Design a protein with these regions (language model features):
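Extended beta-strand/beta-hairpin segments
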Residues: 1-45, 53-124
């Protein structure tokens, strides 16, 4: 569960997830700020973070604990479809079979599976 509360600055929000807190913000029509990520960037961050953790777990399972992982996620919001594009980077690079095994774990990451399903929104 995440709780979000509007702050006094226009469009600035403080949110809490468990014991962790952070801010989000946006600018619309010249109003607002940049004290934190914009809401859609939080979606990108959730996916990139989960994919990175999944990749790290796969690498540890393979005994490749010295391989660095980064995932870049970009959200493309169109009228008919919302598309998440992602790039998995392993440093130093691994062989193709290992890369494909890590990429499969990334494709099966929990947040990617969640966002890939039909979504419904309803009041609590």
């Amino acid at each position: 569960m995440v709780e979000a509360r509007a702050l006094t600055a226009p469009y600035q929000v403080r949110f809490r997830a468990g014991r962790n807190t952070a801010s989000a913000d946006t600018v619309k029509n010249g109003v607002g700020g940049s004290s934190g990520p914009r809401p859609h960037e939080l979606l990108e961050a959730a996916l990139a973070t989960c994919m990175t953790i999944s990749a790290r777990m796969a690498l540890v399972d393979m005994g490749l604990t010295d391989t660095g992982v980064s995932v870049v996620v970009t959200l493309d919001r169109q009228e008919a479809v919302t598309r998440f594009r992602y790039e998995l980077v392993l440093d130093p690079p691994v062989d193709e079979a290992q890369y494909q095994a890590v990429a499969e774990r990334v494709r099966q990451s929990p947040v990617r599976r969640t966002l890939g399903r039909a979504l419904e929104f309803e009041p609590a």
